[in-house]
């Protein structure tokens, strides 16, 4: 990376200008699932219409390949496990729906304009620099910050919903390795580890790694539209790329914990934590 530029993907002309002289676009920009509960229209505008702007920028600048980063949330309450790319899509939130719209727009630009595209459904990403603050706060960093302040990590519901976690550095390596791969055009891939963890087991492991088991867990009411189970089958991706993850779940958690320990020495993180149900 030789330069960076901040812009909003809702500004079409700016997207087109920023994409000049680029060879590849990895489109990760979006607003998250929690945001979609209280601001559905804005969430749609950024995630769906914004994606259309980035696709148009790719087309007008003759980008070599456009990579659309989707989400496991598009699968909703699927009953087909482990989840393959062929599983039915039935998102529960505007976030999931808007990301699925982005997939369709991406495929349409491949079909109509011969733009080389790939859709990547990445399961739950985690690691250093993940959002811990406000309604964007994710369970792993938010819980680490609470534990650092001797507060119990919070579980919404009974703690039995599951997720398939993928460490951010493995994600970065997986994405970078796609450049120049001849086997991925106009294809959709799941990316994950193929191992599911309950929220309860996840937080007990974080407590153990931080040597704070005595804190225990705090249980709050279920959140609306929480997908109950996400467990991926990503063989299609691994076979097409020969990718191998470098991080075990425990090692990824250790690196993540250390990042927030270091960050907490520079700023008061707990004041930015916001705990509420998605309805509010």
Name every feature range the model reports, one short phrase each.
Residues 33, 128, 193:
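Short, conserved catalytic or interaction motifs in soluble domains
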Residues 34-35, 80, 144-145, 180-181:
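Short secondary-structure boundary/capping segments
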Residues 1-125, 247, 255, 259-263, ...:
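N-terminal Rossmann-like NAD(P)+-binding domain of SDR-like oxidoreductases, especially those catalyzing
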Residues 148-280:
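C-terminal substrate-binding subdomain of Rossmann-fold SDR/epimerase-dehydratase oxidoreductases
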Residues 101, 105, 109, 139, ...:
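Hydrophobic alpha-helix immediately C-terminal to the catalytic Tyr-X-X-X-Lys motif of short-chain
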Residues 36-37, 77-79, 129, 165, ...:
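Short glycine-/acidic-enriched loop or helix-start segments at secondary-structure transitions
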Residues 132-139:
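Conserved catalytic loops of nucleotide-sugar-dependent glycosyltransferases that act on lipid-linked
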């Amino acid at each position: 990376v030789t330069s960076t530029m901040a812009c909003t993907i809702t500004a079409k002309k700016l997207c087109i200008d920023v994409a000049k002289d680029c060879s590849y676009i990895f489109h990760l920009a979006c607003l998250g699932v929690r945001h979609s509960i209280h601001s559905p229209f804005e969430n749609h505008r950024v995630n769906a219409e914004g994606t259309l702007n980035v696709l148009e920028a790719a087309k007008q600048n003759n980008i070599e390949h456009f990579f659309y980063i989707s989400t496991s949330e598009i699968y909703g309450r699927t009953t087909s496990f482990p989840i393959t790319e062929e599983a039915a899509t039935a998102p529960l939130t505007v976030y999931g729906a808007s990301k699925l719209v982005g997939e369709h727009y991406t495929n349409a630009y491949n079909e109509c304009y011969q733009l080389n595209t790939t859709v990547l459904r990445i399961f739950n990403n985690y690691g250093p620099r993940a959002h811990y603050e406000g309604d964007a706060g994710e369970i792993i960093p938010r819980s680490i910050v609470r534990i650092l302040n001797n507060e119990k990590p919070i579980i919404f519901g009974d703690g039995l919903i599951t997720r398939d976690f993928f460490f951010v550095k493995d994600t970065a390596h997986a994405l970078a390795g796609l450049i120049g791969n001849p086997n991925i055009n106009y294809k959709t891939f799941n990316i994950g580890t193929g191992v599911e963890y309950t929220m309860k087991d996840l937080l007990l492991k974080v407590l153990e790694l931080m040597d704070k088991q005595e804190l225990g867990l705090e249980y709050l009411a279920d959140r609306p539209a929480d997908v109950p189970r996400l467990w991926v089958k990503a063989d299609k991706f691994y076979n097409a790329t020969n990718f191998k993850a470098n991080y075990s779940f425990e090692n990824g958690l250790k690196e993540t914990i250390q990042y927030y320990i270091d960050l907490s020495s520079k700023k008061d993180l707990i004041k930015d934590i916001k705990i509420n149900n998605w309805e509010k």
